[in-house]
Amino acid sequence: QPSQDFMRF
């Protein structure tokens, strides 16, 4: 489950 997918630079 992509929980911290917002950290994809």
Curated annotation (Swiss-Prot):
The keyword Secreted applies. Has modulatory actions at skeletal neuromuscular junctions. Its main location: secreted. This is FMRFamide-1. It comes from the Eukaryota. The modification Pyrrolidone carboxylic acid is found at Q1. GO terms for biological process: neuropeptide signaling pathway. GO terms for cellular component: extracellular region. The modification Phenylalanine amide is found at F9. It is found in: Secreted. Belongs to the FARP (FMRFamide related peptide) family. It comes from Sarcophaga bullata. Keywords: Amidation, Neuropeptide, Pyrrolidone carboxylic acid, Secreted. Coiled coil: none annotated. Signal peptide: none annotated.
